[in-house]
Design a protein with these regions (language model features):
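Macrodomain-like recognition of ADP-ribose-binding/processing modules
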Residues: 1-182
């Protein structure tokens, strides 16, 4: 558990809670994680994401949007990490349901599988879907910790370090409580 600016972490990869266009936040000076990561990484990250999405648009159709729960790897560019793994978390519009919880599990699982596939031994997770996407913070933290714990039972030797990065004090308290069970 680490509290602070994820864009300052030296890790194999950091996780970006991306939007479905995967081109970064379009609101100048917005305080979301997507904007923070794209701003710190530099224009090269936005350009790589644009190339990826253009290729997928040619393959799947012009209006292609990245599905919820997938993981896409890019370079870290001006960040101290080697890579950024982008995942689109579920958006909670009304009540939380099992499908949204499974979508969030898929985000964590697919990011971890991406790490294994690409020999990335350390990863820092942001709090996926809890900000602009309105996933309840405590439930999101439970899902994150449970999914990572299940993954480590199967692939523990593949990873050296998994960090849960929080920005707010309230999220730190939630994670400390949940992680004390493991």
């Amino acid at each position: 558990l680490w509290q602070g600016d994820i864009t300052r972490l030296k890790a194999g990869a950091i996780v970006n809670a991306a939007n479905s266009q995967m081109l970064g936040c379009f609101v100048p000076c917005h305080r979301c994680i997507d904007n923070a990561i794209h701003s710190a990484a530099g224009m090269q990250l936005r350009e790589e994401c644009h190339q990826i999405m253009s290729g997928r648009g040619m393959k799947y159709g012009r209006k292609y949007e990245e599905p919820t729960g997938t993981a896409t790897l890019t370079k870290g560019y001006n960040l101290p990490c080697d890579y950024v793994i982008h995942t689109v978390g579920p958006i909670v519009y009304g009540s939380l349901n099992d499908a949204l919880c499974q979508d969030l599990r898929n985000c964590y699982e697919n990011v971890l599988q991406c790490c294994v596939k690409n020999h990335i031994r350390s990863v820092a997770f942001c709090c996926i879907s809890t900000g602009e996407f309105h996933f309840p913070n405590e439930k999101a933290a439970e899902i994150a910790c449970e999914t990572v714990a299940d993954f480590l039972k199967r692939y523990g030797e593949s990873m050296e370090r998994i960090v849960f990065n929080v920005f707010k004090d309230s999220d730190r308290v939630i994670y400390e409580k949940i992680l004390s069970r493991f």
